[in-house]
């Protein structure tokens, strides 16, 4: 189904890329590309879905075939009928404001009949277990729900191949389990899956093979059983998350009573009629690390953005050093680093980004 033969690609004005990639993925197989950040995983997925070099300019050699077709001879829309892509940040591929419209959009874009659009949209939403969210605005979906919405929009087009780039990057444990179930169902239905992922534990029951990339080349191939038998030190040395249960650092035996530099009092947030969280009162001790955890959609990101003054609360107060602090004051005192760091960059180079 997927055939890369001596495929090499180097990005324009960069030394990054992949060299001499030859791989074959059979119909209905699930293959995972894994390795350290920057090893070439994403670039291989871009060769398969045609984004490189059509969208990402660079020098390409070799061949890429999908279902026997040389994609260099296909137009972008023709590749899109064969290969569906799900990106690390699903927001980057949304075109509609509500879920049903988002799932229908690819079918509309390809000019399918109104009847077929409705049938495919309803079938995709049901298959991805999103019926209860059908009319929900996509901007208030949890990360896991957004990922499933992105998969549903691809599913509606019935491609032969699904390409997923780091699909669990923004998912919690529950969202990851849900995604694993979704991909397993797709595989059972005969779809071919190619994933780029460095978290391998959740894929052990889905993947048929793992291809380990290093410096833009395929360095090794493993079955799930091969990886289970590798010493944990070897897996960590490869830059991968262990397929075994993780270990936590020990908690301090004594918790000292440090003064609270930041507090919330009765904090509540609603978006339209949706209650994101209600009556949250937290103290953040000076010089300590406080972790806010919970499932996708619990309100963690919204709370962080409110603390930093990037969005407003519905009710309640935030205090810095015991004094109420308005949003403008918080923006001067508290800094925010989101899960998609690319949205915080304003310049084209590291040096320019760091300049005041």
Model-identified regions with their sequence ranges:
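Catalytic Walker B motif of ABC-type/P-loop ATPase nucleotide-binding domains
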Residues: 162-165
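Conserved ABC ATPase "signature" region
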Residues: 115-133
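The feature captures the beta-strand-to-loop junction immediately N-terminal to the Walker
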Residues: 34-36, 293-295
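Conserved ABC transporter NBD signature motif
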Residues: 57-69, 316-330
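Helix-to-loop junction immediately C-terminal to a conserved catalytic motif
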Residues: 49, 308
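Conserved ABC ATPase signature
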Residues: 137-141, 145
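H-loop/switch region of ABC-family ATPase nucleotide-binding domains
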Residues: 197-198
């Amino acid at each position: 189904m997927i055939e890369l033969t001596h495929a090499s690609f180097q990005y324009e004005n960069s030394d990054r890329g992949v060299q001499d990639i030859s791989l074959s993925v059979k119909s209905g197989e699930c293959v995972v590309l894994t390795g350290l950040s920057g090893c070439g995983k994403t670039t291989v997925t871009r060769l398969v879905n045609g984004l490189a070099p059509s969208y990402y300019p660079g020098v390409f050699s070799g061949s890429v075939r999908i279902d026997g077709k040389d994609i260099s001879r296909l137009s972008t829309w023709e590749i899109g009928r064969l290969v569906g892509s799900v990106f690390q940040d699903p927001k980057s591929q949304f075109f509609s404001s509500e879920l049903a419209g988002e799932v229908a959009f690819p079918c509309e874009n390809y000019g399918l009949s109104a009847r077929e659009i409705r049938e495919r949209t309803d079938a995709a939403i049901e298959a991805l277990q999103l019926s209860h969210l059908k009319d929900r605005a996509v901007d208030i979906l949890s990360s896991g729900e957004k990922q499933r919405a992105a998969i549903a929009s691809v599913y509606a087009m019935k491609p032969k191949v699904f390409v997923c780039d780091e699909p669990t990057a923004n998912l919690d444990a529950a969202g990851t389990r849900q995604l694993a179930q979704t991909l397993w169902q797709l595989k059972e239905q005969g779809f071919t899956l190619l994933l780029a992922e460095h978290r391998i534990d959740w894929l052990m029951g889905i993947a048929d093979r793992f291809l380990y990339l290093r410096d833009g080349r395929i360095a090794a191939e493993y079955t799930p059983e091969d990886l289970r038998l590798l010493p944990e030190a070897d897996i960590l040395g490869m830059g991968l998350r262990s397929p075994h249960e993780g270990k936590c650092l020990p908690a301090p035996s004594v918790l000292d009573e440090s003064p609270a530099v930041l507090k919330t009092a009765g904090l509540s947030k609603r978006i339209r009629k949706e209650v994101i969280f209600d009556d949250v009162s937290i103290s953040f001790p000076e010089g300590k690390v406080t972790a806010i955890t919970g499932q996708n959609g619990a309100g963690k990101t919204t709370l962080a953005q409110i603390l930093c003054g990037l969005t407003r609360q519905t009710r309640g107060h935030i205090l810095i050093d015991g004094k109420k602090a308005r949003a403008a004051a918080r923006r001067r005192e508290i800094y925010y680093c989101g899960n998609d760091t690319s949205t915080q960059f304003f310049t084209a180079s590291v040096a320019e980004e760091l300049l005041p």
